[in-house]
Amino acid sequence: MTDFSLPSILVPLVGLVLPAIAMASLSLHVQKNKIV
């Protein structure tokens, strides 16, 4: 049962967390270097 419920929790979590981390690091990178 854990094997079936774990991917269904992990997949949306990774799908939401990874882009959020990428966006945050990108915005921090841009703010630090003042590219804009």
Swiss-Prot record:
Keyword Thylakoid: yes
Subcellular location: Plastid, Chloroplast thylakoid membrane
SUPFAM superfamilies: Subunit VIII of photosystem I reaction centre, PsaI
Matches recorded under Pfam families: PSI_8
Single Gene Ontology BP annotation: photosynthesis
Superkingdom in the source lineage: Eukaryota
Transmembrane feature ranges: 4-24
Topological relation to the membrane, as annotated: Single-pass membrane protein
Family the entry assigns: Belongs to the PsaI family.
NCBIfam families: PS_I_psaI
Protein name: Photosystem I reaction center subunit VIII
Native source species: Piper cenocladum
Lineage start: Eukaryota, Viridiplantae, Streptophyta, Embryophyta, Tracheophyta
